[in-house]
A protein has these predicted regions:
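N-terminal Rossmann-like dinucleotide-binding module
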Residues: 1-42, 46
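Amphipathic, non-transmembrane alpha-helical scaffold segments
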Residues: 8, 65, 69, 167-171, ...
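Short, basic/aromatic-enriched C-terminal tail that caps enzymatic domains
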Residues: 16, 193-211
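Donor/substrate-binding cores of folate-linked one-carbon enzymes
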Residues: 21, 29, 83, 87-200
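N-terminal glycine-rich "phosphate-gripper" loop used for MgATP/nucleotide binding
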Residues: 36-37, 60-61, 65, 69, ...
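Short beta->alpha connector loops at strand-helix junctions that form conserved
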Residues: 55-60, 108
Length: 211
């Protein structure tokens, strides 16, 4: 059984999707801890309602980013996860902290990477005239939103889309994509044990398309 720790900064809608999917008999994973940089994050309340370890590790005034990350990951290590999932975690993790992690960490991003890393992805997709938009799951590395891509889900951009409407449509994709990716890791279909992700025993050359 894959032990998953989740990092989240906000309301926790993707955490809720992960929790719901984890209850399936063949899920292959369970969430063992939820951690946030925000003391009032809705994700923490969701975790506590589900009797899952939950903790806020907030950044202290003038605390270096690497020091905050070290405290965070020391707390995460207490639940002994095999995988860390960033599901709406809004802080950039320091390269120093990442270099000391002994387990893989993945992130859900609301664009079809490598397009539109960073923030405001929905408005940027519309401004660019993109025909498609969606979400991606990738391995977290020191480069922002640039780690190896694992899976994507895409939708067509419609003529009447606004950033808000597009965000809502992509969020529905996120709620399917993230649990599907974690299930694939739990079942060994996606292997993150080496420097290059593998799928079905061969190096993953392109992200899985999980529409």
């Amino acid at each position: 059984m894959l032990r998953v720790a989740v990092l989240a900064s906000g309301r926790g809608s993707n955490l809720a999707a992960l929790l719901a999917a984890s209850r399936a008999p063949d899920a292959g994973y369970r969430i063992v801890g939820v951690f946030s940089d925000q003391a009032d994050a809705g994700a923490l309340a969701l975790a506590r309602e589900a009797d899952i370890e939950a903790a806020a590790v907030t950044r202290r005034p003038d605390e270096p980013r690497a020091a905050h990350d070290a405290r965070l990951f020391a707390r995460v290590a207490e639940v002994q996860p095999n995988l860390i999932v960033c599901a709406g975690y809004m802080r950039i993790i320091s390269a120093e902290a990442l270099s000391q992690l002994a387990i893989p960490m993945i992130n859900l991003h609301p664009s079809l990477l490598p397009l539109h890393p960073g923030l405001d992805t929905h408005a940027r997709a519309l401004a660019a005239g993109d025909a498609q938009h969606g979400c991606s799951v990738h391995v977290v590395t020191a480069d922002l939103d640039a780690g190896p891509l694992l899976a994507q889900s895409r939708i067509a951009i419609e003529a009447d889309d606004t950033p808000e409407r597009l965000a809502a449509r992509v969020l529905a994709c996120e709620h399917r994509l993230l649990p599907a990716t974690v299930r694939a890791i739990a079942r060994g279909t996606l292997d993150l044990s080496g420097p290059v992700p593998h799928h079905g025993g061969v190096p993953l050359s392109a992200p899985l398309q999980l529409d």
